[in-house]
Amino acid sequence: MILETKKRNKNEESIPNKTTSNLNLKIKKMSKNIILSNQEIEHTIKRIAYQIYETFVEEDEIVIAGITANGFIFAQKITEALKNISPLKVSLCEVKMNKQNPELPIHTSLTKEQYTNKGLVLVDDVLNSGTTLIYAVRHFLDVPLKKFKTAVLVNRNHKKYPVKADFKGISLSTSSLEHVQVVFDEKGDSYAYLS
């Protein structure tokens, strides 16, 4: 009888369940140095959306341009928040560029005509050295814009280029050896961490 109970317990332990996978995710997150929780990211998105609306309140239409991957996801979230709080017509644009080699051509999901003479906010998740952001800024300077601003979730103070974020979630003074990563999770478990 005791033997059967042990076998049953061994079988139960080997079957992963939802609780076990959630626990594993929490353990992985705990081993990282979390700097922004999901709730803090959601609050930051709303705050930045209000700041953008205040800046562009006299415009009828603006473009939110997010740099591929996390910058674009962050831009989508800001766009959604802006649509909920303002009457502005908000267009979303994906900025496709090679972050390892930013000198390569940059492509956008909108044509130049679609953002010419409009207000534009360029969005990325983390402003590290400023390389990605400055090359993306340069791309948009080829056309006249009414206003041009930048937004980042995390602003680090180790820039190589004279570029700044007009709207930022948090600013960090870290060593140049530390890296900031942002994880956007569709299940509502997004976070930013220092590694």
Can you annotate each of these PLM segments?
Residues M1-E12, P16-S195:
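PRPP-associated nucleotide enzymes
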